[in-house]
Amino acid sequence: MGPKQRVRKDNYWDSGEADKDREEAEKLHKKGQQQSDSDSDSDDIPISKKKPTSKFAPVDESSSESEESSSEEEVQKKPSKPAAKQSKKVAPTNNKKKPVVESSSSEEEESESESEESSEEDTKKKPSKPAAKQSKKVAPTNNNNNKKKPVVESSSEESESESEESSSEEDTKKKPSKPAAKQNKKAPAKKAAAVESSSESEEESSSSEEEEKPTKPTQNNNNKKNNAKKPPAAKPSAAKQQAKKPAPKKPEEPEVLSGFLLKQRQEEERIAREKEEKRIREEEEKKRAAEQKIIDDEKARLKSIENSKKRAEKKEKQAGAAAEADRMAKLAKLGVNISAVGEKKEKSTNKTKSGGKKQNQVSSITESVEKLKIEEPTSAPKDDVVEVMDSWDNDDYETVEEIQKKKEEEAKRKEEEEEAQRLAAKEEKKKAKAAAAAAAAALIPTTDPTTTFADKSYRSPIICILGHVDTGKTSLLDKIRNTNVQGGEARGITQQIGASFIPVDAIKEQTKSFAEKIKMDFKLPGLLLIDTPGHESFNNLRSRGSGLCDLAILVIDIMHGLQAQTLESINLLRMRKTPFIVALNKVDRIYDWKPCVNTDFKEAYKIQSKSAAQEFDYKVKDIIAALAGQELNAELYWRNKDHRKYVSLVPTSANTGEGISDLMLVVIQLMQKLMLDKVEFTNQLQCTLLEVKVIEGFGTTIDVVLVNGTLNEGDKIVVSGFNGPIETSIRSLLTPPPLRESRVKSQFINHKSIRAAMGIKIVAPGLEKAVPGTSLHVVGPNDDIEKIRAEAKREVDSVLNDVETSGIGVSVQASTLGSLEAFLNFLKKIKIPVANVAIGPVHKKHIMNASIMLDKDPKYAILLAFDVKIEESAIQAANEMKVQVLSDETIYLFEEKLKKHFGAIKEKLRAETASICVWPCILEVTNVFRNSNPILVGVRVKEGTLRIGTPICVPESNCADVGKVIGIKLNEKDVTLAKKDDVVSVAIDDNNTKTTIYRHFDDKKQWMSKITRESLDALKEGWSEDLTKQDIQLLKFMKTVYKIQ
């Protein structure tokens, strides 16, 4: 509860009593001044002040002045300690009022706390003479008219501010001296005023306690007057002291406030205590964790030491055994006879005499080896092992039983190793005699000045060129072939059968300026570029499970980006896992591009305008983003730091020759850095058949690519045929003349022997039935011809047997074995069944095989001819038998043709079966509007779909026919069908039925669509793709209702 407010009376100030009180206050003020002057003059006379009779307390201005002077003296001198506190005077109240305590309880508490603090400081400071503190006087109330009067407070705001300023000045210089006692303010003898003052003092006391360094309250009257000069004031009489004693009163409100502060402090202490305990617990946990970690680390260290010890011992023994076995194996290969492990060899006494003839290289090597002393493999003594184990026992980590067990295991392992070593030595001794002659012959170097290191060690890599139609593949090949042709000379570039061979000398001349900058070292003899169509040269040809091409060049038109066949080529490259680079062709088509004929691209890029360079950068970024969409990382070749993870982009122009040298150099670099071991030359034959052609003057020939090995004239070969393996002998090995004469068919160069890699035309009898895309085998003198024939047959059968034929499907014809395999994968992807497959041109018999589908499934009576020739007899047979033949040279175009073909067949079939097929539905009759001619009813579709033309019957009424639906209305609108849960009005034609509603059937039973076996078959053939799972389930249920088999 707040303090009670004093009721203000306006008539007091208008009356004459206010003037009288003002005059009396002025008189008292003058008396106070005179008295203060007299006090200052008389030092030994005590101050005696009369009690004012007026009901107003005088305003003592001298107190503030004396207070200011005393504060100034306190700054200079040590503060003197105050004496005992005088009691406060209580003013008598009216007859009906009880006496009011002048000082508030908060002021008493403050004065008591101040007195306690001052007593503590007395022990530190020297005490001075105390000065008596005057108490404030209480003005008596007016008894004349028995009314409450307003009171003028004795202390002014000016004195308080002055005292605060003096105290702040004192704090800056020295420690503040605490006053002995605080004088109480004079208050009127009114209950409301007393309560108000007490509440104010409570707020002041609470605010002062919350501060970190509480400031002491200001003094209202003269606390100290010239402490050094003025003697202490005289004590008042006993009567006055008795009168000044305050009436006892229990301060209830301050005690409640003190209890609240106490609880708040206790709560803060509890929180702080809990935080401290939590911190201590966390530190203990961290300490325990650290100790546990130290223990675990020590255990791990001991264990690692033990393991490292074991590994070191094991490695040392294995290394010793391996070194000994290797040394003995080398000696055995050199022809040294080793009797047994551990036996000493006798030193050879054979020495060359000075001046004698030198022995051959083999005998000298054998003699030098025999002079060597073969050391016996000695094992470590057991005493050393025991000593090592004893040293580990000092760690107190292993028990005696464990050490003993390890010793036994070690001894057992040594015995096993020694036994294995003896067996290996015996085996090496057996092989030594057989290998001695060959090893000795191998040590004799054979030098041939006509062969180079590159020709001897490596073959030419086979490069395939892929890309979309009209991206410049053929132009790029022509530019590569004709780059160094000057003055009508080919400069070593020869045109091979189905391939273009670029020798290393031509590549060096073409990339001369570029290769010198990077100090290129050419190790390959050249490049073999396959110029057959991409899908033939790459996807189809198989050579012992790997693709024909070592590296592919994917040509992309920089103006158009990735196109349909480009994506197909990327998929083929991924399927074969063949590395490739990208040639960004037609850079000369960029706007404002300045052509630089036969220049490396980086030099041509430097002279371009800013707009042309920016457009080139934009095009490159678009292609990189498109390749990223195909999950390929790509970058321009001079910025590519990792060729294994990023595809190199080489800008080129087949028209001006820009970037051609860059392309050749990037191919060489990629092959030499990453795939040099793949193009290493071996004597094992690897040859793939490309095409079967009839050449005038030679008959039937085959074009092959010799990947590895050597072919000789007269070799016996085996190739795969349509009717089985073909055995024949090579009559001629032909290559075309230089490039300028390549178009003359009658001129070929005949070779006795050709080494890989090369494109060759082989002339041999009986090659008419050879299968392109298969391997060519050479039969050696010690080879099993039956095994080779089985392998050739298995190569064709593996593809033909992989065809998943269900007896119903299309017929497929392809040019090569590989193209057939690729085409079958494509048809499987688009879910087209295959019934028959064949390789080679389309004949009449193939049309007859396809016509079988006319009886089984007419929509599959088609033949797909992929890149093959169609004979005239086959075309006539197809027209007569109504078999459609679809032919094309690219795979992706077949998808559009097949969609168009099956779409036309489907529309035709639907038109034929529309009047027969019946869709399943179950109806619930809600209203009958008309009984006949026609029947008009309201129905709800419970299951299926209701369509116009659907026959309706009632199965529960002996399958009574209702009629055929001729109209459906939904929300007053005509519709062609009603779906499940639709409520519609239906018009049913009953003219052709012999039943009547409510006589043969009623509306209380379910009505259904009437299905038959013919309607089910027609629905499956023409509308199977439109049937839902719910429709199929409903048809199964209705088959049981109508008992259809």
From Swiss-Prot:
MF term (GO), any: GTPase activity
UniProt source species: Dictyostelium discoideum (Social amoeba)
Positions bound to GTP: G467, H468, V469, D470, T471, G472, K473, T474
UniProt feature, compositional bias: Low complexity: 81-92, 216-241, 351-361
Region (G3): 531-534
Entry function: Plays a role in translation initiation. Translational GTPase that catalyzes the joining of the 40S and 60S subunits to form the 80S initiation complex with the initiator methionine-tRNA in the P-site base paired to the start codon. GTP binding and hydrolysis induces conformational changes in the enzyme that renders it active for productive interactions with the ribosome. The release of the enzyme after formation of the initiation complex is a prerequisite to form elongation-competent ribosomes.
Main location: cytoplasm
Residue intervals of the tr-type G domain: 458-675
GO (cellular component) term, any one: cytoplasm
Basic and acidic residues bias locations: 8-27, 264-325, 368-384
Chain intervals for the UniProt region annotation (Disordered): 1-325, 339-384
Protein name per UniProt: Eukaryotic translation initiation factor 5B
Region (G5): 653-655
SUPFAM superfamilies found in the cross-reference section: Initiation factor IF2/eIF5b, domain 3 (SSF52156), P-loop containing nucleoside triphosphate hydrolases (SSF52540), Translation proteins (SSF50447)
Region feature G4, mapped onto this chain: 585-588
Cofactor(s) for this UniProt protein: a monovalent cation
PROSITE patterns for this protein: G_TR_2
Acidic residues bias (residue ranges): 62-73, 105-120, 155-169, 199-212
Gene: eif5b
Cofactor, how bound (note): Binds 1 monovalent cation per monomer in the active site. Structural cofactor that stabilizes the GTP-bound 'on' state. May also act as a transition state stabilizer of the hydrolysis reaction.
Reactions mediated catalytically: GTP + H2O = GDP + phosphate + H(+)
Location in the cell: Cytoplasm
High-level lineage: Eukaryota, Amoebozoa, Evosea, Eumycetozoa, Dictyostelia
PANTHER family: EUKARYOTIC TRANSLATION INITIATION FACTOR 5B (PTHR43381:SF4), TRANSLATION INITIATION FACTOR IF-2-RELATED (PTHR43381)
Family: Belongs to the TRAFAC class translation factor GTPase superfamily. Classic translation factor GTPase family. IF-2 subfamily.
Annotated region described as G1, given as residue ranges: 467-474
Keywords linked to the UniProt accession: Cytoplasm, GTP-binding, Hydrolase, Initiation factor, Metal-binding, Nucleotide-binding, Phosphoprotein, Protein biosynthesis
EC number, UniProt record: 3.6.5.3
